[in-house]
């Protein structure tokens, strides 16, 4: 059987690292930029669908 040690495994360390406020702020910034980019792409698709000669 495998030994039980008190060291956190890779997943637990990654979750603890993401829980730090500095990393949460960076993650929020990246998520906000991705959502903004998706919104802009969606508007471009809508405009191109409504008016094919635009752009």
Curated annotation (Swiss-Prot):
One Gene Ontology term from the biological process aspect of the record = proton transmembrane transport
- What is its subcellular localisation? Cell membrane
pH-dependence of activity, as noted = Optimum pH is 5.2 for ATP hydrolysis.
* Keyword list, A-Z: Cell membrane, Hydrogen ion transport, Ion transport, Membrane, Transport
Membrane topology, as annotated:
Peripheral membrane protein
Could you state one GO cellular component term attached to this entry?
Answer: plasma membrane
Q: How does it assemble?
A: Has multiple subunits, A(3), B(3), C, D, E, F, G, I and K(x); there may be a few other subunits as well.
* Purpose: Component of the A-type ATP synthase that produces ATP from ADP in the presence of a proton gradient across the membrane.
Its UniProt miscellaneous note says: This organism has both a Na(+)-translocating F1F0 ATP synthase and this H(+)-translocating A1A0 ATP synthase.
Q: What is this protein called?
A: A-type ATP synthase subunit G
Taxonomic source organism: Methanosarcina mazei (strain ATCC BAA-159 / DSM 3647 / Goe1 / Go1 / JCM 11833 / OCM 88)
């Amino acid at each position: 059987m495998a030994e039980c040690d008190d060291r956190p495994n890779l997943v637990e360390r990654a979750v603890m690292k993401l829980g730090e406020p500095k990393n949460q702020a960076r993650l929020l910034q990246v998520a906000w930029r991705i959502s903004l980019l998706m919104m802009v792409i969606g508007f471009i698709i809508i405009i191109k669908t409504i008016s094919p000669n635009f752009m």
